[in-house]
Amino acid sequence: MLSVRVAAAVARALPRRAGLVSKNALGSSFIAARNLHASNSRLQKTGTAEVSSILEERILGADTSVDLEETGRVLSIGDGIARVHGLRNVQAEEMVEFSSGLKGMSLNLEPDNVGVVVFGNDKLIKEGDIVKRTGAIVDVPVGEELLGRVVDALGNAIDGKGPIGSKARRRVGLKAPGIIPRISVREPMQTGIKAVDSLVPIGRGQRELIIGDRQTGKTSIAIDTIINQKRFNDGTDEKKKLYCIYVAIGQKRSTVAQLVKRLTDADAMKYTIVVSATASDAAPLQYLAPYSGCSMGEYFRDNGKHALIIYDDLSKQAVAYRQMSLLLRRPPGREAYPGDVFYLHSRLLERAAKMNDAFGGGSLTALPVIETQAGDVSAYIPTNVISITDGQIFLETELFYKGIRPAINVGLSVSRVGSAAQTRAMKQVAGTMKLELAQYREVAAFAQFGSDLDAATQQLLSRGVRLTELLKQGQYSPMAIEEQVAVIYAGVRGYLDKLEPSKITKFENAFLSHVISQHQALLSKIRTDGKISEESDAKLKEIVTNFLAGFEA
């Protein structure tokens, strides 16, 4: 220890630069040597025990808790993208914090700098600002505490009801479940919309795309589906409950506010989470919102519960991702989208799954929404998402303006796996309906040219017109599956063939009121059995025949 101290003293006493040795320097070195000799002699006089006690005291008193943070500096900032020098060990998609308090996410890891997307207004950041790593990949709060709340893409409450009390958190970019934990779709996810539940049934764990032009009723189908779950969520059976997450991407704030009010009025907000990244939010937040909502839904799926997530809409997420990618100088591809835009949506939608019993038996059902331009379903993003999903509900402007609402094109709409989940009662009544409607559309095109139609063709046209009328349904008025079965039964069994098409809607409303008030036992039997037994069939036939006789009179 003495030799170390001697060496240190000599080093301090020697001149800093060897090239500057002069007479003065030599003189100072002699003085240093003399001082060193004096201090050395003093140390020798001090007892060894005393030296060791002083050293021990110094070592024990030293502050060993050194808090090291890796930091960098902003080289340039603009359009929501910060180029940061430093942060050599930063991870991809790691959250970083700017000196202004704003958060960002590292996306481009380059040799000399890091490309960071900013979650907020980049005017608060200036060149030279310090950026520090947080060491955490972007995560959001999850759990039942979020039900009934409106949050942003990072899970912060934006509804003015105070902070969210959730203690659990999940990363937003989790990997989708593999093949082994999954099981085929087998339970129905009832939307309450006749045209969907009968012709394009959706199962729990399915991905069903809702696609169409703007203002064709895409969001209405999604909202009706959420409202319809009230009949299951008000019960006590956890296996029947379906928790809902609605992700609004790039929409107007007024639209989101109206939607929240509609859900509140229908008493559906208590089992719903709304994740909002509006048009005025930064592009990175619009990109992140679907993944955040998905993580919230996965909490229910992985705890043996059932959840439904609606992405409204993924076209705007793709546009936000394109903006970010181009500003990060990534090479553009078709329609200027980056090369990994397919992966952007596939890694999100693959997280919807029906888990097997060994993994809790939960499910996450996804209803992504895509907006088309002038009905062009062959554009880049629509074809991508169609190929990823398990079917699509195609909405047409032409049908919408004809008054056929929901404006579902039954020919182009398909559900690839949902028929396995359809209830037997609905299969019994709706089995022939899709074929009859397809034949009707085919014949209707030729019927415009000639009046000499045979009886069979006229019958097809007559039935098709009435079934089309029967599938019309008002907004925000979902129906229970047993009520749908009773109404569709009257149509497909030919009881309405003599009724004027203009009177179909009036008949439906009156018939439903009659069945609900007078024949509740029959509806309960259909709901409990899940099928139409011979006894129920005979009873339904009698009810429809008697009611029609009174209705027409």
Swiss-Prot record:
The modification N6-succinyllysine is found at residues 161, 167, 230, 239, 261, 305, 427, 498, 506, 531, 539. The record marks 413 as: Required for activity. Mg(2+) binds at residues 219, 312. Acetylated on lysine residues. BLOC1S1 is required for acetylation. The modification Phosphothreonine is found at residue 134. The keyword rRNA-binding does not apply. The modification N6-acetyllysine is found at residues 123, 126, 132, 161, 167, 230, 239-240, 261, 305, 427, 434, 498, 506, 531, 539, 541. InterPro entries: ATP_synth_asu-like_sf, ATP_synth_asu_C, ATP_synth_asu_C_sf, ATP_synth_F1_a_nt-bd_dom, ATP_synth_F1_asu, ATPase_a/bsu_AS, ATPase_F1/V1/A1_a/bsu_N, ATPase_F1/V1/A1_a/bsu_N_sf. It is found in: Mitochondrion inner membrane; Cell membrane. One of its GO terms (molecular function) is ADP binding. One of its GO terms (biological process) is proton motive force-driven ATP synthesis. Homotrimer. Component of the ATP synthase complex composed at least of ATP5F1A/subunit alpha, ATP5F1B/subunit beta, ATP5MC1/subunit c (homooctomer), MT-ATP6/subunit a, MT-ATP8/subunit 8, ATP5ME/subunit e, ATP5MF/subunit f, ATP5MG/subunit g, ATP5MK/subunit k, ATP5MJ/subunit j, ATP5F1C/subunit gamma, ATP5F1D/subunit delta, ATP5F1E/subunit epsilon, ATP5PF/subunit F6, ATP5PB/subunit b, ATP5PD/subunit d, ATP5PO/subunit OSCP. Subunit alpha, of the mitochondrial membrane ATP synthase complex (F(1)F(0) ATP synthase or Complex V) that produces ATP from ADP in the presence of a proton gradient across the membrane which is generated by electron transport complexes of the respiratory chain. ATP synthase complex consist of a soluble F(1) head domain - the catalytic core - and a membrane F(1) domain - the membrane proton channel. These two domains are linked by a central stalk rotating inside the F(1) region and a stationary peripheral stalk. This is ATP synthase F(1) complex subunit alpha, mitochondrial. It comes from Bos taurus. The gene is ATP5F1A.
